[in-house]
């Protein structure tokens, strides 16, 4: 039995006044829930966590922390053409990452246009978002540039907290402050009506803003946590006919988390960084999509993945290689 697919288009997003990815998903799929964490929002789908929900952009996996945490704020809603949600297990096609479901974001890449757009929003607690897009597409060549900045001061509901049977003062926030930057660039080239190429790259960072630890009050921290990622990719598509396509895609991602010390601690001075985790992800896929009959689609493909993680305490890299071939109909 096929799993149900929900689709929300750019026009529906605009009419509903949706400004972020979390709002769009909440409207689409009642089985989705969110709760805040250091990476932004922790997603739950059909009772399963981020780790078992596959998030794709134009069919390519979005990577984050190895535990499955992905900062959903890095999805630029001004670029979204539509969002497709496969609500239910899809592990036979996508692997164990997709036991809870699949979310695929399709972005808009207009042709024969020179356009610049700016989108800003400001809400309570000094929550600010600014997005900039520049599209230059003429003839066979296209360039699509995006930048998004997000900031929040964080807040606390009460300056008091329980400590056993006592009520004491605290500076611990209910929601952490943060600042993030997200830059992406994509180039496309249509060599012929049948053959096209693309190359893309991006940079992302997010820094948390905790209150500094103090001796006279609880709730402070010795350090802030920062997250940083680079990604790059390239691919080609050859159209044998209207319903028959051969496609190659490669993507890479480096992701690191660090402590930025606020006070002198563990041999580090204020302002110095300590690496806590480094991840590398590489994925290469060659596939063919064929419409042998009017009402069916058949895929044949091979996929190679390499994942690497390094922790400073071990000073060693651990690698995992995965090769697979598939042919669902």
Where are these regions (language model features)?
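N-terminal periplasmic "start-of-domain" segments of outer-membrane beta-barrel proteins
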Residues: 1-12, 42, 50
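Non-catalytic regulatory/gating segments with a bias toward low-complexity or hydrophobic composition
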Residues: 13, 25, 83-84, 103-105
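Short acidic/polar hinge/loop motifs at secondary-structure boundaries
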Residues: 60-87
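Face-selective signature of the C-terminal outer-membrane beta-barrel domain
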Residues: 188-205, 227-329
């Amino acid at each position: 039995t096929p799993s149900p697919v929900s689709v929300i288009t750019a026009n529906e997003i605009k009419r509903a006044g949706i400004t972020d990815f979390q709002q769009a998903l909440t409207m689409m799929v009642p089985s989705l829930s969110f709760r805040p964490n250091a990476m932004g929002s922790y997603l739950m789908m059909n009772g399963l966590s981020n780790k078992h929900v596959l998030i794709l952009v134009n069919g390519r996996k979005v990577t984050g922390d190895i535990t499955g945490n992905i900062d959903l704020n890095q999805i630029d809603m001004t670029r979204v053409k539509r969002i497709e949600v496969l609500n239910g297990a899809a592990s036979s096609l996508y692997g164990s990452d997709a036991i809870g479901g699949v979310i695929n974001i399709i972005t808009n890449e207009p042709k024969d246009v020179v356009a610049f757009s700016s989108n800003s929003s400001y809400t309570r607690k000094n929550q600010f978002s600014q997005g900039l897009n520049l599209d230059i597409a003429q003839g066979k060549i296209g360039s699509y540039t995006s930048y998004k900045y997000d900031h929040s001061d964080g807040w606390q509901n009460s300056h008091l907290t329980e400590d056993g049977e006592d009520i004491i003062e605290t500076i611990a926030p209910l929601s952490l402050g943060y600042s993030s930057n997200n830059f992406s660039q994509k180039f496309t080239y249509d060599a012929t009506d049948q053959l096209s190429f693309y190359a893309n790259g991006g940079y992302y960072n997010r820094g948390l803003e905790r209150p500094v630890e103090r001796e006279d009050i609880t709730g402070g921290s010795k350090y802030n946590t920062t997250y940083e990622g680079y990604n790059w990719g390239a691919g080609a598509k050859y159209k044998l006919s209207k319903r028959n396509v051969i496609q190659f895609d490669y993507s890479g991602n480096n992701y690191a988390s660090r402590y930025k010390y606020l006070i002198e601690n563990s041999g580090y001075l204020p302002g110095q960084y300590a690496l806590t985790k480094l991840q590398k992800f590489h994925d290469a896929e060659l596939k063919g999509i064929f419409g042998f009959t009017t009402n069916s689609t058949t895929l044949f493909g091979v996929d190679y993945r390499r994942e690497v993680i390094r922790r400073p305490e071990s000073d060693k890299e651990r690698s995992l290689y995965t090769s697979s071939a598939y042919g669902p109909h």
